Amino acid sequence: KDLEPPRPMAQKIKTILISQPKPSTEKSPYFDLAEKLKLTIDFRPFIHVEGMEGQEFRQQRVDLAQHSAVILTSRLAVDHYFRIAKEMRFEVPDSMKYFCISESTAYYLQKYVQYRKRKIFHGTIKFDEVVALMKKHKNETFLLPCSDLLKSSIPNALDAGGFNYTK
């Protein structure tokens, strides 16, 4: 027993860092946990996506009117697509089709369009499922709003499927 090194005392956790934005309502389980365990919770989003300016988008010579479908991979993509459309004074037509990576992204579209009226298709998180839905609409011209750091699997899947798309 004399040869054993002394054991360090366990330290009590006082602060937790959560890598997402602070919830807008006080009904979040994080606040309940903080109150129950007497913790301090810091909310810091680690990923910050800055939208492209309308002028910068125009310089890329992408014509929104030439696209009949949009591939949306996140809620941020939805927000930035409609912000750019508004900046460019482009009225999104009723015939526009939306291909969303998940059901939650599809429901988020309700913020901008009437869900029943438009043609909205969604997968369940896997992009391959979205590609399978897109194969039924192969004659569409797709727009893929994305960041500079896009997974290579998404353009690879679109190229393999032979889709006409613009990033």
Question: Residue ranges of each PLM-predicted region?
Answer:
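N-terminal amphipathic/basic-hydrophobic helices that include classical n-h-c signal peptides
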Residues: 1-8
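Conserved beta-alpha
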Residues: 9-167
